[in-house]
Amino acid sequence: MQKTKKTQANSASVTADTTKPRRARTTSKPISTDTAKPRPTVMRPAAPKPRSVKTPAKGFSAKDEAAKPRRIGTKMSRLLASNVAPVKPAIKPVAQAPRHEGSSAALTHWLLYCRPGFEQDCTQEAVGQARSQRPVLAEQPGIIPDSGYAIVAINEQTLSYRELIFARQLIRLHHIIEELPERDRLTPVLAAINELTGTFSEIWLEVPDTNDGKTLSAFTRRFGPLLETALRAQGRLLPVEVEAGRSDAAEAKKLPRLHIFFPDKSSALIGTSDPYNSASSLMGIVRQSMPAEAPSRSTLKLAEAIEVFLDKSEQTRLLRSGMTAVDLGAAPGGWSWQMVRRGIRVTAVDNGPMKGVLEKHPLVEHLKQDGFKFQPKKAVDWLLCDMVDKPAKVAELIGDWFVNGWCRHSIFNLKLPMKQRVTALDAALNGIRSRLDREGISYKLIAKQLYHDREEITVFLSKTKNR
């Protein structure tokens, strides 16, 4: 009996022990309970480490591949060229790779914003632009799908923002900070900025254009004033009166912008942009409000295109009351409305109905015809085209209008295929260029994937003068 009671007591003791709370296991990094502030991880160049390579990557020799330093395993570091490694606690530049044989410049890292889902296209295009200028060493270090940004490394000092289609913004990347302490993000960010020299025209705090990025907006609104106050106290930002354009405005425009990009709350990318080689809007997004009278949201696409492609003087000169336009694929009238509101007479070509104020507007002539077969009786100032078809077919149509002298300016959309987007766009746009060159027509062509574009890009084409 005593033995039985002892056994029961031991059993009860074991049962009691199992009821005690246990420390939960997790695959993520443990949160430190120390009172001292954690030290952030910041990127700096790592020394090259030769490695054997069986098959060189396209565009690289075996010698190039062997000279590449090893990669590192952190999430942010995978986005960088393989010459970058984390260190503590010093802050060092990220873009100082060993110089490539035959090149006079070290690798420069660029941060590109883009529409989520187009990171590969954005990167491919940027690297292609660099290689088209001269034989260069260019890398696509890594891509986070649907992140809304990409990082490329090339041994060229400059990319041309105006010639990039998928990039919303072009920023030269200087520092990457990881493991930002939750209670004091300001100190490491200021330390990284202090590694840069000079004064900045303004500071932009930005986040990815994703659902996760939008959750950081409240944080940047709180953090921004603290950082700006600290930088002004150090004399790193222009005085408020200069920034507002009340004095020395011309000099202010020459200064670089400072960008602090937060992929998440624990990481920050520090970069600068050239005001003459970048987008002039926060996050590279030109936002538009929906007009109450517009018949469809497609009107926002053309409104953004006009703001992006034409400066104020060009808008005044090229979009004058009394001009004429043809809108192919016009229904329900979103693009036509942008012309009509400026007093431009529109011939709307579409088998579908026009809606709202455009249904019986005195400046709109609605023709129920096929946009690909329509030919104007006389030349017009503007051709608008937002028809859904293969980019090569639409490009051929646009070329016909310019070669035949039916229009002088055009804004049109090219719908993107599911695969080989950059290749398809290059073929379509180069087809237009080749035709106009053969005809001796001087022109201006700019293409961008706008904020209001989805699986498409928007193109501005303008005839200047015959050669």
What are these regions (language model features)?
Residues Q2-K6, T18-P21, D34-T35, R51-K54, ...:
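SAM-dependent transferase fold signal centered on methyltransferase-like domains
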Residues S11-A12, T26-S28, P38-P40:
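Intrinsically disordered, low-complexity, repeat-rich polar/charged segments
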